[in-house]
Amino acid sequence: MKRIAIIGGGISGLSAAYQLEKARATGAGIEYTIFESSPRLGGSISSERVEGCVVEAGPDSFLTEKPWAAALCKELGLGDQIIGSNDSQRKTYIVVHGKLVAMPDGLMCP
């Protein structure tokens, strides 16, 4: 029996656990434990409702041109929860001194 430690319960750690769980389902002799320092899984990814709006933190999207992400969502039973973007409303905001400030179109941060 192989014993595996997964350090961190963010998207990478959870993806590793998912792949290991699939291997276990086919008979692989694997035990794994996820070690996460915070009280919740998800790493920097989170969603909160603030005054009726969903506020996303961390990466909140993926490119559907990369079919593996959409395929994984469908495999996990989340395919019907994928929400396409509305290009006419696509805008990025940051919080500066407690206020939302729209970022200029096309601005990229390193």
Where are these regions (language model features)?
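Short, solvent-exposed loop/turn segments at secondary-structure junctions
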Residues: 11-12, 39-40, 108
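Conserved SAM-binding loop
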Residues: 5-6, 34, 61-62
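Beta1/beta-strand and adjacent pyrophosphate-binding region of the FAD-binding site
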Residues: 1-12
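Dinucleotide-binding Rossmann-like beta1-alpha1 core, especially the glycine-rich loop
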Residues: 51-110
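Glycine-rich FAD pyrophosphate-binding loop
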Residues: 21-50
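Hydrophobic residues within alpha-helices
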Residues: 16-20
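Gly/Ser/Thr-rich beta-alpha loop segments that engage phosphate groups in nucleotides
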Residues: 10-15, 44-45, 60
